[in-house]
């Protein structure tokens, strides 16, 4: 859902999909206005709620949360329990969560860095987000997200088997995810 919606750079009216490869260097300069696509410079979050079936414990519900500009952030699973990971919790230093602040900083420095007046601040540098070399920000973060999901999957499966979320195990998972995200250079 995140890839197909929150990070979609397809426009059916214009009949373009930036991911097709037809809009990368050397075919184009790689600059496009964000207003033609779902993710916008002003987008601050995207969530997907993974609920439970009737009769299942509601605490097994997960809110997959992308804080900041979705193309420059990663989805973090959050459970309806005490204690959220620090990376998604508000910090006065950033006036946001560290993950949101890092995502927005990356977007400002690498995606929306063309500011010559007259609305140019809405131009996104597509080549930095997604390129034919596979080194774009979104391409690298998709791999990080997949690795995070592989870390989360055993915990999810164990929680479903038990019918509940163990808070100590959840705290350990959050710590591991936060360490992993830091190791990827997404956080200080």
PLM features per residue range, with description:
Residues 1-188:
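C-terminus-biased signal that marks the final domain/tail of proteins
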